[in-house]
Amino acid sequence: MKFLPYIFLLCCGLWSTISFADEDYIEYRGISSNNRVTLDPLRLSNKELRWLASKKNLVIAVHKSQTATLLHTDSQQRVRGINADYLNLLKRALNIKLTLREYADHQKAMDALEEGEVDIVLSHLVASPPLNDDIAATKPLIITFPALVTTLHDSMRPLTSSKPVNIARVANYPPDEVIHQSFPKATIISFTNLYQALASVSAGQNDYFIGSNIITSSMISRYFTHSLNVVKYYNSPRQYNFFLTRKESVILNEVLNRFVDALTNEVRYEVSQNWLDTGNLAFLNKPLELTEHEKQWIKQHPDLKVLENPYSPPYSMTDENGSVRGVMGDILNIITLQTGLNFSPITVSHNIHAGTQLNPGGWDILPGAIYSEDRENNVLFAEAFITTPYVFVMQKAPDSEQTLKKGMKVAIPYYYELHSQLKEMYPEVEWIKVDNASAAFHKVKEGELDALVATQLNSRYMIDHYYPNELYHFLIPGVPNASLSFAFPRGEPELKDIINKALNAIPPSEVLRLTEKWIKMPNVTIDTWDLYSEQFYIVTTLSVLLVGSSLLWGFYLLRSVRRRKVIQGDLENQISFRKALSDSLPNPTYVVNWQGNVISHNSAFEHYFTADYYKNAMLPLENSESPFKDVFSNTHEVTAETKENRTIYTQVFEIDNGIEKRCINHWHTLCNLPASEHAVYICGWQDITETRDLIHALEVERNKAINATVAKSQFLATMSHEIRTPISSIMGFLELLSGSGLSKEQRVEAISLAYATGQSLLGLIGEILDVDKIESGNYQLQPQWVDIPTLVQNTCHSFGAIAASKSIALSCSSTFPDHYLVKIDPQAFKQVLSNLLSNALKFTTEGAVKITTSLVHIDDNHAVIKMTIMDSGSGLSQEEQQQLFKRYSQTSAGRQQTGSGLGLMICKELIKNMQGDLSLESHPGIGTTFTITIPVEIIQQVAAVEAKAEQPITLPEKLSILIADDHPTNRLLLKRQLNLLGYDVDEATDGVQALHKVSMQHYDLLITDVNMPNVDGFELTRKLREQNSSLPIWGLTANAQANEREKGLNCGMNLCLFKPLTLDVLKTHLSQLHQVAHIVPQYRHLDIEALKNNTANDLQLMQEILMTFQHETHKDLPAAFHALEAGDNRTFHQCIHRIHGAANILNLQKLINISHQLEITPVSDDSKPEILQLLNSVKEHIAELDQEIAVFCQQNN
């Protein structure tokens, strides 16, 4: 019986559990909160108070998706967390009982609210309250911001990056587009669990994590304190949680809103601080209380320029993108969340430049500025939010004393206001102003400075991170602390007020936390290149100068040593001279006494003169017959002035050696003889006749080279003008033709003018080539029997239009006897006449140009043509006439006209080659007359061979033509020309394709460009000729030099033609191409007779057999190669047997022999090289058979 109470209690417990499980919720036993935050009493209306008194209990629903930071249960089923603290405050503020129920999800909680089972739903973190007409939401209870997290050791990673990065998140928050705004190439990995997402960043699997600041910071504080760090907060997208009530519960909604309004930022910060070690932004829940004027200012100035000093840790640093980091970077991040202002950094090297030397308007805010009264005249300062003492930094030593000694070098930054005060306190110290405190730490460590003035925070950071066992710091007594704040241009008081309000809203504990965070931050590297670049360049320059000067000094010493060796050699030569004067010196040397008599000489002296004239050389130097008569007087005068001097004097003059005058470089010196009262003269000379002549010849050649260079430059300038002018005209006419506004007559005229301009350009190139041919001796005259009056008349007629356009009278008269022909090169004669006539019309502005031609008989078979071209132009001066027939020479009037300056030079040379003469007579302002005389052979026309009537050009029919050119425009033009003449044309884009087409098909003519990629026209011709191909080949080239044509003919071309190729030229050369006859080709391998006998001369059957043979052998041969490589001997022999059988049917003897050899050769590793060689022979032979089969099929189609 004593167990009955326990059994009853157990049954009751089981019943209650079963009953509880039947419900949709779990009811918590209460709220556990140790928060001592209090609220001011809520000002509720009587109506609201009565409602609360009647209500007595508020049932609040939550759901399981609430995170542990916001809401969780302890072991006694009591709720804890930030939301629990807020609910506890609500309970105390309203003095009402709260009942909390946990539902499985948000929807079930909302269903309970709508059905009246609960009064309030406390939502999870959402972007906005639910849109429901039956539900009302209060103002947000909690606001969270997206936080960017990375590893602690990589805290200086850029906050934005265009490089590929991996970013983790939870439950698709924040959205992709938000992440891609800062990381366009980010790979986003979504996790379902926050711990897993953060662990992936800590392990290095992902670069960043982005999530809610409250939940993320709580997780970091618990599990990742020493590995992860929040580096930035984003302004959006924010998340909120709300109290949700039914729409009809108006009083309840108003009471809850009063409660939310009573939660000041300070209260919210204290509530969150119990649960968050970092990332507590609860002080941002309520916006700043800005005036309308300040709000308007922010709208007008959303983006501000921030001056950033990257060398002032931990206050301010920059990452690789130049973004502001450090304490000031985090403060600016918070200000952005408060105000929406955006900050763009402008990096400077130190605060002097930042604060006072930038132009107004170039910056808006300077973070981390140290307040001073002097600087307040230039800038505005916000209220100080960091205060730190000044310290001295010195080297750490066992006997270190915390004081400054006399003579120490102490550095102080320019922008510290302590300079004058410290100078008074320590007058015996040498104070050195520096640009930046952080950069001076290294100088203290190296001993360049004895001490440095810095702020305590800056010193602590630099020593802990870079000089932990080398430097230490101590406080400076008797000086005020440094006050750090923001500075602004004096014209921006509104910005100052806004920043002050933002700073005042930041709790001091948050500023301290940020400071400690950055002081303890590991692995932060400061790029000091800008600070030391100037010193680096100076040191580098000095080093280069030092090395250069050393090299120069070494080079100077080397030259000195070499010079010393030369002098030493001269001394040795003098000693040798004293010992053996006559044997050692090849140049003539002699000794003269003070009276001028030659007392000794060497053999070279005697050999220099003829035997007869040697006597004169031995006469006293003062004798008028002596060749050295001019030497003695100069020697005597010099000696009288410098008797003790051993200077060698030289003189260049000419002497007679008995045969000719020779130029010598004569030298003499005084030699005092200790045993004699008088000194002697040691003399000699060097014959420099050849040297002088050589120098003169070199000078002549040098002048020629200079003149050639000048002529070349003049030629290039002239050719540039002469080629550009017609090309510009052609382009202009083509541009007109591309339009649609021209009439038919205008289009014809434009085409005609463009063609004529092109012909003039070809004429210019022809002139240049004529000069080349003439000067190289390659110009060959081709004399013919010519009717000179008719030739002159036709040439004059071609210039009639030009003369008429200038209103110049052009007349042509002749006294030639009738029926006489002369033997002369008509092209050369016409070129001379055209040049002279063109010049006459060019330089005549008014008047007339007259041409007269006459024939002066010498005998019955010989005569002289005399022709004059007279104009009334500007005329030539004598100086201009002297230069007229030189290459590229132009008169002053000629430079105002177009022309190459080659025409008259060519005329002169052509007339000279025809054994004639060209002269001129000209007077300025009157005109010029050119006279041509040429001796010629003559014959009466009746006795001459009558010229055959011009036969019409007959073109061969049915030509198969292949053109090879890599330029599609050239191929198209030539194809259209040949199509116009009625020929079928095939095309190849280079020599390789042309070779392939020729091997596969028969052609009657190949026209190939000379310059092509891979295989050019010359190489293509050589390869075809190596194959014994008789195919006619014409080469085309734009290089109009004669050697290019010779190169083409030498490699086997039938013709080498110059571009452009006109229809007339094509017709002329095609007409000379023999008509293609149906000739039975010679076959090297195919036995056509056997094939005819086997097929009863059935051409169709013959072609089918040959095509079948081609198809089968092209299948069997690769199979044989593959079988041999795979070791399949049976398949190999089957393939070779089929090839052997086909060869027997067609009586292909060479193929029969090779395939038989393959069949009888056993396959082994030793015989494989021989078999492969035989297979390659089969392959080459089948390729030759393919060509012959192609020719046979084409001939019989």
Curated annotation (Swiss-Prot):
Superkingdom of origin: Bacteria
Keywords of this entry: ATP-binding, Cell inner membrane, Cell membrane, Kinase, Membrane, Nucleotide-binding, Phosphoprotein, Signal, Transferase, Transmembrane, Transmembrane helix, Two-component regulatory system
Residue ranges of domain HPt in the record: 1098-1197
CDD domains in alphabetical order: HATPase_EvgS-ArcB-TorS-like (cd16922), HisKA (cd00082), HPT (cd00088), PBP2_BvgS_D1 (cd13705), PBP2_BvgS_D2 (cd13707), REC_hyHK_CKI1_RcsC-like (cd17546)
One Pfam assignment: SBP_bac_3
The enzyme's E.C. designation: 2.7.13.3
Reactions performed catalytically: ATP + protein L-histidine = ADP + protein N-phospho-L-histidine
PROSITE patterns referenced in this protein's UniProt entry, alphabetically: HIS_KIN, HPT, RESPONSE_REGULATORY
Signal peptide start and end residues: 1-21
GO CC field: plasma membrane
Membrane topology value: Multi-pass membrane protein
Location of the Response regulatory domain: 960-1074
Subcellular location field: Cell inner membrane
Periplasmic side: 347-537
Segments traversing the membrane: 326-346, 538-558
GO MF assignments: ATP binding; histidine phosphotransfer kinase activity; phosphorelay sensor kinase activity
Processing and modification events after translation: Activation requires a sequential transfer of a phosphate group from a His in the primary transmitter domain, to an Asp in the receiver domain and to a His in the secondary transmitter domain.
InterPro entries membership: BvgS-like_periplasmic1, BvgS-like_periplasmic2, CheY-like_superfamily, HATPase_C_sf, His_kinase_dom, HisK_dim/P_dom, HisK_dim/P_sf, HPT_dom_sf
Modified residues (4-aspartylphosphate): 1009
PANTHER family (UniProt xref): OSMOSENSING HISTIDINE PROTEIN KINASE SLN1 (PTHR43047:SF72), TWO-COMPONENT HISTIDINE PROTEIN KINASE (PTHR43047)
Classification via NCBIfam families: PRK09959.1 (NF007420)
Protein name: Sensor protein EvgS
Lineage: Bacteria, Pseudomonadati, Pseudomonadota, Gammaproteobacteria, Enterobacterales
Gene name per UniProt: evgS
